[in-house]
Every structure is written in structure tokens, then in C-alpha cells.
Design a protein with these regions (language model features):
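Structural preference for beta-strand elements that scaffold enzyme active sites
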Residues: 29-35, 55-58, 97-101, 133-137, ...
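Short, acidic/polar
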Residues: 36-51, 112-129, 187-202, 224, ...
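Active-site groove signature of glycoside hydrolases
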Residues: 58-63, 123-150, 281
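Aromatic-lined substrate-binding rim segments of carbohydrate-active enzymes
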Residues: 59, 64-102, 145-166
Length: 312
């Protein structure tokens, strides 16, 4: 009888413990990833990533327009106070996956030097043998349908050398490939004739994708994620994740405004999305630090960790 009573006590104690978990504590346990465009203080950045329990980092390491000579030789642009390769090694040693993030040109529709991307992919493939990063992440988001074939060809060529991770714009979920058929050479379009949407085509020539569900209302983001999930399930070997962003400059509407009023709903939303997609990405390190603690990390900033502050 005593043993049964003890089991009941343990069981109900665990329920009470779980129910008393704060939204921030639940956030810490949520499976999540982080975009990083720069890391002014690498020591603080690593503390932030590890203590917030991020398990993957998308680390910006250059673009073709400005860093081709460096990237094509297997070197990386350092977006902080520490050599990018050393930082990647440090993160991986802490069981944090890394995707090397690059982009093509400052102008999103400029594909004039796209052939150089294959040289970079080849060099990154060689670098991956020693650096052991997960994939080459392409932050390439053209708005012109005329370059969609070049976008797909870029991924296809790069994938010969290194796993490819692609950004997806929400509008591409609804871009019927048949509607842009005229932008393709007939023979190349034939490769994608079974694809319903542009997202289907991108998933066909990449290994991973990230849907950029920016700062919209919760209902809009949920619609995007549901439609993304439908397409994702048509490609079972493809890993697709959503990316959520809270813009600290937005104060009127969207999830950023909601977060400023009460962060509970966002943390719950983040947890639910992560469960559905087996992980969710936050964009990006500087903005998220500002959202949580009311300051952007800088080279001389002290590290702060704990419950979010109420920013004025």
C-alpha cells in the first residue's frame, strides 16, 4: 500500500512540476534553430546558443558578389570577432549542427554570376570533409519568375558537391509551376513536369528547406505552415522547417506586437510548431537578443541570460 501511495505522490508531483513550468522554461526545452548574420562577441554568442538550447545554427559566411575569391578557395567570411571555421568547430564540439549560409548577389533577381556558385559549392564540399558542417544554406529569394529556372539549376549543380539547404518564400507555396512554364527551356521543364508548385520543384533539387514565415499574424503563419506541411509530405526524403521572425521595430501588429504585450502566446506557438515540424528556426540572433533582453549584442556587451525583460 505504501509503495502505491508513493507512486501516486511521484506521479502528481511530476504533473505539478510540468504545469508550473514558465513559458520561458518551456521555450528553453523546445527544439529550435537560430539564424546568425553576425556575432560581435563570439564568447557571448556561444553562451547564448548553448544556454538557450539551440541545436542548429545557420551561420552567414559570405556571398558570391563580394566574397567569391575567398569562398571558391574553401575559405569563409568571418562575420564576427572569431575565425568562422574555429567558431563552427566550437559549435559542433558542443553538438550544435551548423549550416553555412551564403547568398548570390545583393540584388535578389541578379543571377548574372550564378555559374560561380558551382565553384563555391565544390570548394564547400571539400571543406565539409574536414569541418563536418551539415549543409550549404542558400539565402536566395528572387521575386522575378524569369530566374526561377536558374534558381533550380543552381541548386541542382551545387548538390553534386554538397547537401543543399534552400530558403522558401511564402508566396512560392502558391506559385503554380505550370504558370511559369514559359520561363523554362522545354527540356529542362520536363524534369519538373510532375511538380505542382515552385516549392515542389525546389524540394526536388535540394535536401533541406526553410519557409520564411516572417512577422505576420498568427492566423496567417498557421495557414502558411499548414500548406507547407502538405507540400512537404509529398517529399518524404526532404527535411523542411519553418522560420519565425520577430521584428523588434514592429509595434502595431503581427507576432512581434503580440510578443511585446505578452510573450506567453509566442512561446506556446513556438513549442507547437516545433512539435509539428520536429524543430523550428528563429530569425535572427541579434533581433532575438533584442526582443528578449532589450539590447543588441555588441563586441563590448556583457552577457545576459534569464527570463525575458519587459522592453519599454
Amino acid at each position: 500500500m505504501k509503495s502505491i501511495l508513493l507512486l501516486f505522490i511521484i506521479y502528481f508531483s511530476s504533473i505539478i512540476t510540468l504545469s508550473s513550468k514558465s513559458p520561458f522554461e518551456a521555450y528553453l526545452q523546445t527544439k529550435k534553430y537560430l539564424y546568425v548574420w553576425s556575432y560581435p562577441n563570439s564568447d557571448n554568442f556561444v553562451k547564448f546558443v548553448t544556454q538557450h538550447n539551440f541545436t542548429r545554427v545557420y551561420l552567414y559566411c559570405g556571398c558570391i558578389e563580394w566574397d567569391y575569391d575567398k569562398l571558391s578557395k574553401g575559405n569563409l567570411y568571418d562575420s564576427g570577432d572569431k575565425d568562422a571555421k574555429l567558431l563552427i568547430q566550437e559549435l559542433i564540439s558542443k553538438n550544435i549542427e551548423v549550416e553555412i549560409a551564403i547568398y548570390l548577389n545583393d540584388s535578389p533577381n541578379d543571377f548574372s554570376n550564378v555559374e560561380k556558385m558551382e565553384d563555391v559549392a565544390k570548394a564547400m564540399g571539400e571543406l565539409q570533409k574536414t569541418l563536418k558542417f551539415k549543409a550549404l544554406h542558400f539565402d536566395v529569394e528572387p521575386s522575378s519568375a524569369s530566374v526561377y529556372p536558374k534558381l533550380l539549376q543552381m541548386y541542382e549543380n551545387a548538390r553534386k558537391y554538397v547537401p543543399v539547404s534552400a530558403i522558401l518564400k511564402p508566396g512560392w507555396l502558391y506559385k503554380q509551376l505550370e504558370d511559369v512554364k514559359g520561363k523554362f527551356d522545354e527540356d529542362y521543364y520536363a524534369k519538373f513536369q510532375q511538380c505542382e508548385t515552385l516549392v515542389d520543384a525546389i524540394m526536388l533539387v535540394s535536401d533541406y528547406s526553410e519557409l520564411m514565415a516572417y512577422d505576420y499574424r498568427y492566423s496567417t503563419i498557421e495557414r502558411f505552415l499548414n500548406d507547407y506541411d502538405v507540400i512537404r509530405k509529398r517529399h518524404p526524403s526532404h527535411e523542411g522547417k519553418p522560420v519565425l521572425e520577430l521584428d523588434p521595430n514592429i509595434v502595431e501588429e503581427g507576432i512581434s506586437a503580440e510578443f511585446k504585450k505578452d510573450n506567453t502566446k509566442f512561446f506556446e506557438f513556438l513549442e507547437n510548431v516545433s512539435k509539428k515540424f520536429d524543430g523550428v528556426t528563429i530569425h535572427n540572433y541579434k533581433s532575438w537578443n533584442l526582443d528578449l533582453y532589450c539590447f543588441k549584442p555588441s563586441s563590448n556587451s556583457e552577457y545576459y541570460f534569464g527570463e525575458p525583460k519587459q522592453c519599454e
